[in-house]
Amino acid sequence: MQNLLKNLATSLGREPFVADKQGVYRLTIDKHLVMLAPHGSELVLRTPIDAPMLREGNNVNVTLLRSLMQQALAWAKRYPQTLVLDDCGQLVLEARLRLQELDTHGLQEVINKQLALLEYLIPQLTPFSVASRVGWN
């Protein structure tokens, strides 16, 4: 994994990535945080998504969550990413990749897909967009 991340840093024209105390590597690309962490035989990419409209007080907006999950199912054949709620209830875009099958080019492709999906999802989570999609107008 170290060689993979070293090669990724080189190909992105960056200094070698350094893990934090929890072993998580943090990359900021196009103003988006992409966290990479080894998990057994996998490399997990995670990007938290700021989605205050997903919460209604202490509850989750089920209609919006259902819509987002349906979209995640639709892209599942083309993208390794899925949407998850973390332990704090925050929406996270996540991909799990087998380290044995991963090379630098493949990792870059997955990161690019992560960024593309973020650009697709984030506008849907603005107050106006959410209101029009779930009938809050």
UniProtKB/Swiss-Prot annotation:
SUPFAM superfamilies: Type III secretory system chaperone-like. One of its GO terms (cellular component) is cytoplasm. Pfam families: CesT. GO terms for biological process: protein secretion by the type III secretion system. CDD domains: T3SC_IA_YscB_AscB-like. Keywords: Cell inner membrane, Cell membrane, Chaperone, Cytoplasm, Membrane, Plasmid. It is found in: Cytoplasm; Cell inner membrane. It comes from the Bacteria. It is a peripheral membrane protein. Interacts with SycN to form a complex which specifically binds to YopN. Functions as a specific chaperone for YopN. It could facilitate the secretion and the subsequent translocation of YopN. This is Chaperone protein YscB. It comes from Yersinia enterocolitica serotype O:8 / biotype 1B (strain NCTC 13174 / 8081). The gene is yscB.
